[in-house]
Amino acid sequence: MINQQLLHPESIVVIGGSNNVHKPGGAIVRNIINGGYKGVLRIVNPKEDEIQGVKAFHDISELPPTDLAILVIPAHMCPETVDRLAEEKGVKAFIIISAGFGEETKEGAKLEQHILDTCERYGAALIGPNCIGLLNSWHHSVFTKPIPTLHEKGVDFISGSGATAVFILESAVTKGLPFNSVWSIGNGKQIGIEDVLQYMDENFDPERDSHVKLLYIENVGNPDKLLFHASSLIRKGCRIAAIKAGSSESGSRAASSHTGAI
C-alpha cells in the first residue's frame, strides 16, 4: 500500500544514520538535508549525540511518534525494529535500505516475511528491502548520487534494481533530463512496480502529474495488474518506456540479486 506517510511524511527517522557520508546511513541523511526536507528529521544512533547537525536519539524508546522510518541497519535487526516502530511509535511507512533478506538466504526470507506481516498488521507501507530508497520533491530518501533535477512534469522512474537506477540517473543527469520521482523497489516484498503504477493511475491528474513513466523491470508479481494500469495510463495520455531484465546472461545475473521478489 502506498500512503501519504510514504510520499509526504511530516516526520522522518533514519535508523542507523551516521556522520560518514560515504556509507548509506550517512549518505541518506545528507541527501534528505540537502534536498530541503521541510518536515522533522530524526536519527537513531546509539553511539552519537548529533548526526550532521541533527540531534541523535540513542534508542527507539526516546522517539516521538513519526510518519516514515528508513532503516539502514543489519538485516537481522530489522524485524524487531519494525515491530517496535509500528507498535510504539505509530510509524505508517518504512523504507528498508538493508540487504541480506530473501535475495540471499532462506533465513533472510523469513526476516522479510516477518517485516511484511508487521506492516500489513499495522497498515504500514513498505519499500524494499534491499533498495536505494525513494526520491520525490518532498523528500530525497536515497543514499546514492547523483540527485537529478526535479520537476512535476519530469519522468517518473520505477526500478527493480538500485544499481541500474543509479546508472540511468547518471546518464540522464548529463543530458539534462528532469525527473518527478524515483522509486527503487528492491525486493518488492509489499510494493512492486505494478503497485506503483496502480497508484499513479488511480491518482492521475493530467494537469499536475508527469506523463512519462520509465520502468526497469526484473520481476513482476502481478503481470495482469501491470498491464491493466499501464494501458490505463496510456489511454490517459501517458507514455511508458519499459526495459525487462533477465533475458540475457548478464541480465539474469542482475535479476538474481533480487530473487526475493520472485
Q: Which residue stretches match the model-derived regions?
A:
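Catalytic-core regions of core metabolic enzymes
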Residues: 1-262
